Amino acid sequence: MIQIDQLNYAYGHKQVLKNIHLEFPENQFSVILGRNGCGKSTLFKLMAGLEPVKDGLIRYAGKSLSDFKGKDRAALFGFLPQFHKTVFPFLVKDVVITGRAAFSRYRPSKSDWECVDQALLDLDIEHLRDRPYTELSGGERQLVMIARILVQAPKVILLDEPTNHLDVYYQSYLMKKLRQLSRQNFTVIAIMHDPNLAFLFADHLFFMRQHEVVKPESKTRITDPKFLKSVYDVEFHEAMIQDKTIVIPDDSWL
């Protein structure tokens, strides 16, 4: 389990995280929702070790994140940022093998390449192995970057807005794959903007507003329009489709 206690963070005088308390269950698919600028991406940077934790504590399995160094950190967290761009036409297999860099001092071993093939197979993209990365669609590129994370064999996969710029097919496909990975001994945590995708695929949902974690009142549904308005500043309506609840923004507020 990942535990975050009394976490605060600021860029200069601008407070971007305020007294964050969160617990992410192990081997589950969790999603963090909230408006732009509420602190979600900064939280991920702290969890991934890209920014130092100065005020508060992040623990994995009861051990402080600051105790994990180098290879141990790489074996703990795999991080997919919002933006990743490759301008050179590297082959997919060569992009994925870079995920083994923390574990190979020299050239990749046979075992490293076997990890690449297995990751591509797990994501059903083995047919892309020898394709130039720059020729792939946005959805295919996202899957390749997730394969790059899988070859690290991390315990936790962090994904910052993984469905951004994807069509409906790849959004659904990717969310299904992330849920499957959480059933294969990965703890998967994603930042997302679409609450309906999160409602349909995630095991656990967390909400942020104005740099803080917010929770619905006891016995209040997470799809409750009043609660969601407090998060997004938008009026919502609930709808039931095949026993699943979705929410629809009300355009009357515009």
Regions found by a protein language model. Name each.
Residues 132-136, 140:
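Conserved ABC ATPase signature
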Residues 97, 110-128:
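Conserved ABC ATPase "signature" region
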Residues 157-161:
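Catalytic Walker B motif of ABC-type/P-loop ATPase nucleotide-binding domains
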Residues 33-35:
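The feature captures the beta-strand-to-loop junction immediately N-terminal to the Walker
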